[in-house]
UniProtKB/Swiss-Prot annotation:
It holds the Pfam family Ribosomal_L17. Belongs to the bacterial ribosomal protein bL17 family. The keyword Ribonucleoprotein applies. One of its GO terms (cellular component) is cytosolic large ribosomal subunit. This is Large ribosomal subunit protein bL17. NCBIfam families: L17. Gene3D superfamilies: Ribosomal protein L17. Part of the 50S ribosomal subunit. Contacts protein L32. It comes from Persephonella marina (strain DSM 14350 / EX-H1). The gene is rplQ. GO terms for molecular function: structural constituent of ribosome. Keywords: Ribonucleoprotein, Ribosomal protein.
Length: 124
């Protein structure tokens, strides 16, 4: 039984929701920051933080698990291991930051946000 286990469904089945988080995480890793809704950014944060914590371990098992979680996207996994994780090595969590934007999405008036890594190699 799933007592007290609550996750946002985003009105999607489980597989679609997991695919959404994987795709958002890959975009965040590749670009350093992405613009999405506040709800998706808040739901994405723990998923990405677990990936970064896993990448900081630098073991073969961690690399294989990370590749499995990112659906064998080796480009994103390599960037996470070689560029992002070393920058966040001294940090114990809190790898991402969420900014709420004043603008809203045109179609449904959803509040937008930017989620980004606190330290990122592509940062200006």
């Amino acid at each position: 039984m799933r007592h007290r286990v609550k996750t946002k469904s985003f009105h999607r089945p489980k597989e679609q929701r997991e695919a959404l988080f994987v795709n958002l995480a890959i975009a965040l890793i590749e670009h350093g920051k992405i613009e999405t809704t506040v709800q998706k950014a808040k739901a994405l944060r723990p998923f990405v933080e677990k990936l970064v914590t896993l990448a900081k371990k630098e073991t073969v098992a961690a690399r294989r698990l990370l590749n499995a979680r990112l659906r064998n996207n080796t480009k994103a996994a390599t960037k996470l291991f070689k560029e992002i994780a070393p920058l966040l090595k001294e940090r114990n969590g809190g790898y991402t930051r969420i900014y709420k934007l004043d603008k809203r999405r045109r179609g449904d008036d959803a509040q937008m946000a930017i989620i980004e890594f606190v330290e990122h190699p592509d940062k200006e």
